[in-house]
Amino acid sequence: MTGDSAGAASSLWLAYHDDLADPKSKDPVLRQSSRVCGAIGLGGQTTLDPFLLEKEIGLAAIKHPMIWKTVGATSHEHLKKNWEKYKALSTECSPITHVTKDDPPVWIRYGKPAPVPVIKGDGIHHAGFGRLLKKKCEKVGIKCHLQVAGHEQPKINNNDFLKRTFAK
């Protein structure tokens, strides 16, 4: 599974989320496992928690509408002010929430150097999202290969990751 930006977030969410299959369903599609063997994400958002993002990346990350529109808030200020209303959905939509020891490996890339805080520019694709995810994956003991332009380089490139992941 792979995706870029919000597609990366969706790919990571599916990679980490518990199986959504309903083995008792009459619908054969709903009986199928939703688990994947791995994911590649490019510039993906790993959390929608505005407080964590502001602390770890800066205000530029939470000002992007993807962070607050995803959960139905009208602005980043509205999201923070009414956090209790949006917290459950924000948490559910965040891939990092679902990381557990039984999850597949992922390979993620962020194409720009990552100053913190973001002074101006594209905070929604900041490498801090990847660093947060890698830290969580290391904590639970699963593979997260992180590439950040001009900084972190994984021991395996994305093509070799795909070959190894699908060879299993």
Language-model features: locations:
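Primarily recognizes the serine-hydrolase "nucleophile elbow" in alpha/beta-hydrolase
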Residues: M1-I57
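Extracytoplasmic/periplasmic, Sec-exported soluble proteins
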Residues: T2, A6, R31, T91, ...
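A short alpha-helix capping/helix-coil boundary motif
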Residues: A8, S75, D102, Y110-P115
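Mobile cap/lid helix-loop segments that gate and shape the active-site cleft of serine hydrolases
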Residues: L20, P50-H98, P104, H125
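Surface-exposed acidic, glycine-flexible loop patches that form ligand/cofactor-binding
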Residues: V29-S33, I96-T100, A167
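Short, proline-enriched alpha-helix->beta-strand connector loops that line the catalytic pocket
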Residues: S33-C37, T100-V106, V140-I142
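A general alpha-helical scaffold signature found inside nucleotide-binding enzyme cores
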Residues: S34, A61-I62, G128, L132
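C-terminal catalytic histidine-bearing segment of alpha/beta-hydrolase fold enzymes
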Residues: V106-K168
